[in-house]
Amino acid sequence: MSAEAADREAATSSRPCTPPQTCWFEFLLEESLLEKHLRKPCPDPAPVQLIVQFLEQASKPSVNEQNQVQPPPDNKRNRILKLLALKVAAHLKWDLDILEKSLSVPVLNMLLNELLCISKVPPGTKHVDMDLATLPPTTAMAVLLYNRWAIRTIVQSSFPVKQAKPGPPQLSVMNQMQQEKELTENILKVLKEQAADSILVLEAALKLNKDLYVHTMRTLDLLAMEPGMVNGETESSTAGLKVKTEEMQCQVCYDLGAAYFQQGSTNSAVYENAREKFFRTKELIAEIGSLSLHCTIDEKRLAGYCQACDVLVPSSDSTSQQLTPYSQVHICLRSGNYQEVIQIFIEDNLTLSLPVQFRQSVLRELFKKAQQGNEALDEICFKVCACNTVRDILEGRTISVQFNQLFLRPNKEKIDFLLEVCSRSVNLEKASESLKGNMAAFLKNVCLGLEDLQYVFMISSHELFITLLKDEERKLLVDQMRKRSPRVNLCIKPVTSFYDIPASASVNIGQLEHQLILSVDPWRIRQILIELHGMTSERQFWTVSNKWEVPSVYSGVILGIKDNLTRDLVYILMAKGLHCSTVKDFSHAKQLFAACLELVTEFSPKLRQVMLNEMLLLDIHTHEAGTGQAGERPPSDLISRVRGYLEMRLPDIPLRQVIAEECVAFMLNWRENEYLTLQVPAFLLQSNPYVKLGQLLAATCKELPGPKESRRTAKDLWEVVVQICSVSSQHKRGNDGRVSLIKQRESTLGIMYRSELLSFIKKLREPLVLTIILSLFVKLHNVREDIVNDITAEHISIWPSSIPNLQSVDFEAVAITVKELVRYTLSINPNNHSWLIIQADIYFATNQYSAALHYYLQAGAVCSDFFNKAVPPDVYTDQVIKRMIKCCSLLNCHTQVAILCQFLREIDYKTAFKSLQEQNSHDAMDSYYDYIWDVTILEYLTYLHHKRGETDKRQIAIKAIGQTELNASNPEEVLQLAAQRRKKKFLQAMAKLYF
């Protein structure tokens, strides 16, 4: 053998050998092996693994000669395996914390049921009917263990669990996990049904005044012996491990408290019970000490529960004065005593007892309330934020963005409060040097961030600032501030001689120009301009601000005024008036226009008419933004002035097109159809395109109730809009000699551009006029040859069904216009069902099925009091229902499809059955069966689930079909009522899903 080989062999033989893992069946062969194994310092397999192995082997199903799966046999081998599992649990002293952590719910359920069985608890007997006081101690303890585990499992299941990262997919593992998940859910369902009984059992246990005993490995061996070999020791003897009454009550109180606390989320009154149990637990822990064998309670978690209960159920007795800061803060927040919260936070800056995260959560809650419209909380938000910022500074953290935002506009009150918080948060006698340094740096940074020297002086002269900063540091701070922007005056006190320096003319002019920009008082504007013109005659003061804009049709006339002062005054008054009107400051706009009108009346009839026109537009806007929104008709003199404007024939008067638009829209909005159709002068129809359009709209609305043959104006309106949406064609010869066709958008073929038409429509509010326009554009959209899904609209039949020259229409622009119009109309009235249906159809046509369902459901909801009444059949037509069916089908919500098939006038069984056959459904499936009223569909469901072997779902379908109100022999009214009730519930459920 070579030297290398010898070394290798020596190294290999010198390694310690890992003893082989003991197999589960070895414990069957040697009775004493289990105790020896469990006495090892690190037994392999671990005790909990042994429990799993023993119970897994004992519960394995058997296969008979006919290859049929049989339940596990009740033979000696399986009984011994179950006993071994119980003995391992006894070795662990029945510690539920250990067992729950390591065993799954099905395994622990099986283990505790075996404990009940071996403890002679009669199977099938309700624990709540048993008298614990008369039961043998070990039997009573077994019952308590099971019911404690039951409510602990229910509580644990209510907590969110982070899903484990899935490994590589293996079919066998996935099937096993799915089976275990279903089994766990079934057990939890049973435990929740019995939860009330379990709580009663545990409440009864608190009344016991005797010690109990828990099974040990020895008592389990005795129970397993033949009755004649027990040597006189019985189950009621003291052979088990003693559990003192106080220990048992302490553990039960804690578990009951957790159960009550979990129930409090749905019934707040139960929090009182939880509080009582948790505080009793604290008392019992103080009595028995923390070294108890059978009372393992997480005292930190218990303290958290107690604090939460203090907040949720504040005590009314004398202990309320000893509330924790948590409880005090929550009580103050509930009662709106925010000043007390601020005081608690300031005191906490010294004690540092409240976590920073908790303080931040309080600030977030206050911000949320302030954003909801409670403006009084803005000051409170700043004060709480200041307290939190000082806490951050003391602990060496950076200043939050929130504080910087709230301190953007400092004032005396904010700085006073900040200095108060800083002073009360630092104990200068006990504070460390690093803490003092943090506070000093913070105050320096605040000073450097301030521009107003008055505020800088407030901080620099404060006692805390003087104490924390040395003379050299204060001097250095002043030097730093001197190097900043020169616009900041660095003198602590104003220099008296500064006021003796005479201001230059340019400074005075600048100040007056600044006042001129800010002022909206006509008299003050006039005075400023007189002063400015007295100082200099070279400037044109209408150019001072580039924000002063006057329409180009007016500016030529105004700038032609020879007198400079008058020209500036007229221009500025008009510009400011137009700006005020734009920002809806109508009162100032009226003052400015009135002053301008008075001024120009003296020398210019042309400008006088201009101002009258602008004041008319202002009065229209004022009415529309004020009483017009409440539906109050405008005064008759305003209507007369609008008519006068439309009929005006003064030559050389500059006119703004927007005034004509607003006047025509005003007449349409207030249903002045008689005037527009019969009284408008003929020359207006030829010269003003908006009057022409308004006349056609008014006439179409007026003729709408009449027969189709008489609707000539509808055809005229159609032709006008088609012409507007048409494109002009040009021919171009390319380099290769070929002639190509070019479409030029926004052509001049129509009476106005499409963009102008859209702008005009967005000034309308009258529902019928908007419906007519929307209907026209929908029809124009549907005329396309390549359209797949038509959009529906009211009055669509009044329009022509074809266009002679389809190629000339810009259908892309039409589609965009339809979407714009629907968006606008719904902003005017979001509860108009016909407009909602159009919006839904648009989404349907563009394959946005979830959004389409949202609007179909909203259309039904607005006309049925959220489905509490029947949806009118003219809203949910067969076409709408079929589109809803298609949406659900394409969203893979196949059960919803089947239910909607019932809404059709003739139930579509073929589609319903086909959808129910789909197994990959993304909806609630069998939870929807209660909404089916058609017995044929329910019968098909029963057959389908029976065929698939889906017993639970089949039972749900049978339960639904067995309801007496669906009996075919019932009167028609009863059947209709049953159907209507299910329709209502289903549509409300759908609305909650898609809204």
From Swiss-Prot:
**One Gene Ontology cellular component:** integrator complex
**InterPro entries of this UniProt entry?**
Int8 (IPR038751), TPR-like_helical_dom_sf (IPR011990)
Residues bearing the modification Phosphothreonine:
18
Where can the motif WFEF motif be found? Answer: 24-29
Q: Does the keyword Phosphoprotein apply?
A: yes
List the keywords (alphabetical).
Chromosome, Disease variant, Intellectual disability, Nucleus, Phosphoprotein, Repeat, TPR repeat
| TPR repeat feature ranges | 250-288, 320-356, 570-603, 833-866
A biological-process GO annotation: regulation of transcription elongation by RNA polymerase II
> Quick one: where is this thing mainly located?
nucleus
Domain of life according to the entry? Eukaryota
Coiled-coil boundaries = none
Q: Which SUPFAM superfamilies match?
A: TPR-like
The free-text domain note is: The WFEF motif is required for the recruitment of protein phosphatase 2A (PP2A) to transcription pause-release checkpoint.
Q: Which disease is it linked to?
A: Neurodevelopmental disorder with cerebellar hypoplasia and spasticity: An autosomal recessive neurodevelopmental disorder characterized by global developmental delay, profound intellectual disability, seizures, absent speech, spasticity, facial and limb dysmorphism, and subtle structural brain abnormalities including cerebellar hypoplasia.
Q: Note the subunit structure.
A: Component of the Integrator complex, composed of core subunits INTS1, INTS2, INTS3, INTS4, INTS5, INTS6, INTS7, INTS8, INTS9/RC74, INTS10, INTS11/CPSF3L, INTS12, INTS13, INTS14 and INTS15. The core complex associates with protein phosphatase 2A subunits PPP2CA and PPP2R1A, to form the Integrator-PP2A (INTAC) complex.
Instruction: Family membership, please give it.
Output: Belongs to the Integrator subunit 8 family.
Role:
Component of the integrator complex, a multiprotein complex that terminates RNA polymerase II (Pol II) transcription in the promoter-proximal region of genes.
Q: Mind telling me what this protein is named?
A: Integrator complex subunit 8
